[in-house]
């Protein structure tokens, strides 16, 4: 069992039951999945960009991402239907908890000028989104071997009904909120 998974069962669940007064353990919010998404609009010009991005996401997530393709043609962006324009990977279970552990304890502190993550990036249904500007904050990425700095979006889906419950859940995982 992953370190954060044990931490959730032993510390987070009792703390949230005490804070929100849940009657059952099954009412306590939990993280269901984490999705990493990398949009690669510049991949239209060069196919190697997709390969490098897939390699980076594979190292970061520990599993192979799926290449997302354009749903429809957009002439202004020089994109045809079916062109590869991104990569995404969905993490669940043990891999999800291990990624969350690495993200909170190792990757976030490596962000330049880091003052904490925004407490307002919740969607109203208990899900949280973080944008990362550079993939080099992850220790799995070798700085000398990257071709370009690419950002990615990290979406954390929870079973929380409200944003307050989700924020309390993530804060109990030692998420460094700034407000």
UniProtKB/Swiss-Prot annotation:
GO terms for biological process: translation. The keyword Ribosomal protein applies. Belongs to the universal ribosomal protein uL5 family. Signal peptide: none annotated. It comes from Burkholderia mallei (strain ATCC 23344). GO terms for cellular component: ribonucleoprotein complex; ribosome. GO terms for molecular function: rRNA binding; structural constituent of ribosome; tRNA binding. This is one of the proteins that bind and probably mediate the attachment of the 5S RNA into the large ribosomal subunit, where it forms part of the central protuberance. In the 70S ribosome it contacts protein S13 of the 30S subunit (bridge B1b), connecting the 2 subunits; this bridge is implicated in subunit movement. Contacts the P site tRNA; the 5S rRNA and some of its associated proteins might help stabilize positioning of ribosome-bound tRNAs. This is Large ribosomal subunit protein uL5. Pfam families: Ribosomal_L5, Ribosomal_L5_C. InterPro entries: Ribosomal_uL5, Ribosomal_uL5_bac-type, Ribosomal_uL5_C, Ribosomal_uL5_CS, Ribosomal_uL5_dom_sf, Ribosomal_uL5_N. PANTHER family: 60S RIBOSOMAL PROTEIN L11-RELATED. Part of the 50S ribosomal subunit; part of the 5S rRNA/L5/L18/L25 subcomplex. Contacts the 5S rRNA and the P site tRNA. Forms a bridge to the 30S subunit in the 70S ribosome. Disulfide bonds: none annotated. Keywords: Ribonucleoprotein, Ribosomal protein, RNA-binding, rRNA-binding, tRNA-binding.
């Amino acid at each position: 069992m992953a370190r954060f998974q044990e931490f959730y069962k032993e510390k987070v669940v009792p703390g949230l039951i005490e804070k929100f007064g849940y009657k059952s353990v099954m009412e306590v919010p939990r993280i269901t999945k984490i999705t990493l998404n990398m949009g690669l609009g510049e991949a239209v010009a060069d196919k190697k960009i997709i390969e490098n991005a897939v390699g980076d996401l594979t190292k970061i997530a520990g599993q192979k991402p799926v290449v997302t393709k354009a749903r429809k043609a957009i002439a202004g962006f020089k994109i045809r239907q079916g062109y590869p324009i991104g990569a995404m990977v969905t993490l669940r279970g043990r891999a999800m908890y291990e990624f969350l552990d690495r993200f909170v304890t190792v990757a976030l502190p490596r962000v330049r000028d880091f003052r904490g993550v925004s407490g307002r990036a919740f969607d109203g249904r208990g899900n949280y989104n973080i944008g990362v500007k550079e993939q080099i904050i992850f220790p799995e990425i070798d700085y000398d071997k990257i071709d370009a700095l690419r950002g990615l979006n990290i979406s954390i889906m929870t079973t929380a009904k409200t944003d307050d419950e989700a924020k309390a859940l993530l804060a109990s995982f030692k998420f460094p909120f700034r407000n």
